[in-house]
Amino acid sequence: MPKAVAVILVNWNTPAFTANCIRSLIEYCDNLLFDIIVVDNGSTDGSLSTLSTEFPELIYIDNQENLGFAEGNNKGLQHSIDAGYEYSLVINTDTLVDEDIVSGLMTHLNNYPKAAAVQPAIFWMHNRTKLWNGPCGFNALLGITYSKTQDNIQELISYQNVEWVTGCCILIRNSTLKTAGLFNKQFFLYYEDVELSYRLRSHGYEVHYLPTSKMYHEAGISGKSSTKSAEGFLNPFIHYYTSRNHIWFLRKYGKPVFYPLNWIYNAGYYLAVLAYLKLRGRNKKVSLLLKGIKEGLFTPQTLIWPNN
């Protein structure tokens, strides 16, 4: 019989961060509860060799190419389901824990059978008293997603039934994935967690935020550079994926009665971003943002996800 939880880490050229995350999980969490699956997304820096040398006991999946966050995690999730694990913990590699979040999150799902998934409170790595991600929601009027990070949110002591949970760290009940499907690989990167949350909820499940479990996040390590280029620190492709996937999400899950205001508000937002990028000379970002908007509006959504 497998252990209860498969912990899934998707690595892409970040072996040092991944190793630190693994060490913290091994140190603080009950090792009898989980196995760790490292999915390497076509790293070019020898990540797989580095990690497997230090942690030979882990399970490794070599994707050979960068399949994106969504499909990279799907490879680990499919292995978890096929191997008979009850739960899967999807967790970013640039995170650390200093408590047993595996048992905390698992106990919560055991106590709430209607919940398909649960996330902990996530704090900034560099400021461990400041919340990076709290209860997540969707403003249907404006057509934007959000996460509550105000100081008073930290005072929550009971779980919240929320609209979506972040892919930074989610414990998911595998049986619900068999019903609703895995991440939508068409999204590749960004909004795949929001879309899956809404799909799980459309099947009658709940998704929860558990403030009594916590972890720490570096945030966006694979999407930013340590040195500033003509395009700044942020990878230009982030503008492409976030704009395209945001619009796809609105087309699928937005409320038609609010569409006029959604499009007016977001058109204004994207025009402001385009103007800012143009003034800063970030021409590649301008081009990719326009491409993302165009594809979001006009590319058919195939809504591909594996079903078991």
Residue ranges of predicted features:
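Glycine-rich, basic loop-to-helix element that forms the pyrophosphate-binding segment
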Residues: D62-A83
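Short, acidic, metal-binding catalytic loop of nucleotide-sugar glycosyltransferases
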Residues: R23-L33
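A conserved acidic beta->alpha catalytic loop
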Residues: S24, D40-S49, E65
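Conserved donor NDP-sugar-binding/catalytic core segment of glycosyltransferases
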Residues: L96-W132, F138
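A short, conserved alpha-helix in the catalytic core of glycosyltransferases
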Residues: E163-I172, T176-L182, Q186-Y216
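Short beta-strand-to-loop acidic/aromatic patch adjacent to the donor-nucleotide binding site
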Residues: Y85-L96
